[in-house]
Amino acid sequence: MRRLPVFLVIDVSESMAGDNLRSLQDGIERLIRTLRTDPYALETAYLSVIAFAGRPKTLTPLVELVAFYPPRLPLGSGTSIGAALEHLMGEIDRNVKRSTPEQKGDFKPLVFLMTDGKSTDDMSAAQARWKRDYANRANLVAIGIGPYAALEGLSSISPNVLRIENATEQDFKKFIDWVSASVSTQSRSIGTGEPPKVNLAKVDESVMKKIESIAQAAAVDEDFVIVSGKCQTLKLPYLLKYERAKHAVETSDFRVDTT
């Protein structure tokens, strides 16, 4: 039976600490519950989870939906998107069956790469390799979490780059529902033959916006600072996440909100 491999490639760097990581953890469970109600997805979709920070790691290898158990997302330092792409390409080579003269292989993998930051490694070699060897072998969808995710590197290798403008709990739920609907749509479309391109569900523009240009893809977050340290007593690493707070300045003559 031909499978539809689905890879979730998730940024678990320090900037994801807190609500974002917790929402993605809950989102994976929500995704599986929804897909298990779709007979088309149950028949064809196989899911894998790859987490990356400074280094990538496969948390769950490709497995059918009925046997999938949501992994616990770790937390790390760094945002090595280039290394994550190299790891993803290795997973595709090892686990996705290619067509031969004797039999057809798996359908084109569907990849959802999610990040809230800018790559901390050199992506150029991975970008070139993806465009040369994998752009026609897999459908990559890149999602920026929050208004400050720098997606210019990914927009050069995929026409499907989107941004979640406000990473609220409800927005994450709607985003996960969109991922689920996209997997279901792709599962249904391959029933009549392999589609020439990815078939995604309609984007809810109140939650996500498609990136149309390199200028839209670049952003810098000046409201957060992440500091890493090591406990002198326990010798364990820790993270401190600071958010710029707004303050109200008021005198007898005027009132203004400042940062």
Regions found by a protein language model. Give the residues of each.
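Short, well-ordered amphipathic alpha-helices
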Residues: I28-R36, H87-K97, A126-W130
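Von Willebrand factor
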Residues: M1-T60, A67-F107, L110-M114, N139-G153, ...
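Alpha-helix termini
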Residues: L35-L42, D93-Q103, D133-Y134, S187
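VWA/integrin I-like adhesion module and closely mimicked acidic/polar interface patches used
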Residues: S99, G117-I157
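Von Willebrand factor A/integrin I-like adhesion domains
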Residues: P147-D204, M208, V227, T233
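Short glycine-/polar-rich loops that comprise or flank the Walker A/P-loop
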Residues: R3-L4, F107-K108, N136-N139, S158-P159
